């Protein structure tokens, strides 16, 4: 209703009188103050804080399986065509690994266009990243185009076994329908091969070296390829986590490499990294980044 008069239109169609877009803009968000200003003529006096509240930009959760992949893409200075989902947060600092986001499925069709328009010049330094549910929604036809029209491009499907962005809904790859009942499960690897992609491989995004190896190998091949980055969403109830990590202060030299992954479980206190054990899932991404082995199991 913030943008389009959806409920308002339905009310009017039912013959009901209602107040809507003649008072509220179709641009920007609604707020309590805006509603009060339009309905009673003045906004209520709010509480003024002496100190400004620090900003809290959106960030991928602690233990998010997408974090390791995006760190690897950023490390290798690749151009990344993103898509719509939790992984869109890969565009946010400090990862800042996503270069474009247009609409659902545009990553796959976009990289196909890149490959053709650049006549191969961008093939070894550009990838598309799309989620499992978004791929099922609108990425399949783009992949068919890549196979049929022979694009030398790599698509990375980030498979977290759920539709995380909108509240953990099931999708055709999970084996359950929206009611939670068992349903036919789409095999992503078999589907990609059936669409004409011969090079399909699966990696664990928690394994940074394996991710980097897979990406480099697929980018070096003159053929369309798919990498499936597979690990369940860290917020799924059935996912078992490792013990939280802790910082060995004797080994830590405050190089801040562990901060480059952008994990909300790690913060700096007096210039030293500190792990919040209530958030840490023990995924080990930060441990792999530390050259001094200063992050240990708690």
Identify the meaning behind each predicted range.
Residues 4-13, 217-268:
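Glycine/aspartate-rich loop-and-adjacent alpha/beta segment that forms the canonical ThDP
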Residues 46-108, 117-120:
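Active-site diphosphate/adenylate-binding microenvironment
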Residues 28-32, 50-52, 58-66, 133-137, ...:
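Active-site glycine- and acidic-residue-rich loops that bind
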Residues 4-5, 24-28, 87-89, 135-136, ...:
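Short gly/pro/ser/thr-enriched loop/turn and capping motifs at secondary-structure boundaries
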Residues 116, 122-123, 245-254, 274:
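Generic long, charged, amphipathic alpha-helical segments
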Residues 1-45, 243, 297-298:
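Terminal amphipathic helices with adjacent charged low-complexity linkers/tails
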């Amino acid at each position: 209703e913030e943008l389009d008069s959806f409920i308002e239109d339905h009310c009017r169609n039912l013959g009901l009188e209602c107040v809507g877009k003649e008072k509220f803009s179709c641009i920007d968000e609604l707020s309590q103050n805006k509603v009060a200003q339009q309905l009673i003529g003045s906004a209520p006096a709010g509480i003024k804080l002496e100190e400004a509240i620090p900003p809290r930009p959106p960030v991928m959760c602690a233990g998010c399986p997408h974090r390791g992949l995006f760190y690897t893409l950023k490390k290798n200075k690749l151009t990344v065509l993103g898509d719509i989902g939790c992984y869109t947060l890969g565009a946010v600092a400090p990862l800042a690994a996503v270069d474009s986001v247009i609409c659902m499925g545009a990553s796959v069709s976009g990289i196909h266009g890149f490959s053709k328009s650049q006549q191969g010049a961008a093939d070894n330094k550009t990838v598309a990243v799309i989620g499992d549910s978004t791929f099922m929604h609108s990425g399949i036809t783009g992949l068919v185009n890549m196979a049929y029209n022979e694009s030398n491009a790599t698509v990375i499907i980030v498979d977290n076994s759920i539709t995380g962005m909108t509240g953990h809904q099931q999708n055709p790859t999970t084996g359950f329908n929206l009611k939670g009942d068992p349903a036919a499960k789409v095999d992503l690897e078999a589907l990609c091969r059936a669409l004409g992609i011969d090079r399909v491989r699966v990696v664990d995004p928690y394994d940074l070296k394996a991710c980097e190896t897979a990406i480099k190998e697929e980018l070096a091949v003159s053929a369309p390829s798919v990498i499936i980055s597979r690990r369940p969403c860290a917020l799924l109830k059935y996912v078992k986590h490792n013990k939280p990590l802790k910082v060995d202060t004797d080994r830590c030299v405050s190089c801040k490499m562990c901060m480059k992954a952008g994990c909300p479980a790690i913060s700096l206190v007096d210039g030293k990294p500190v792990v919040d054990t209530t958030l840490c899932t023990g995924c080990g991404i930060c441990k792999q980044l530390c050259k001094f082995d200063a992050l240990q199991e708690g």
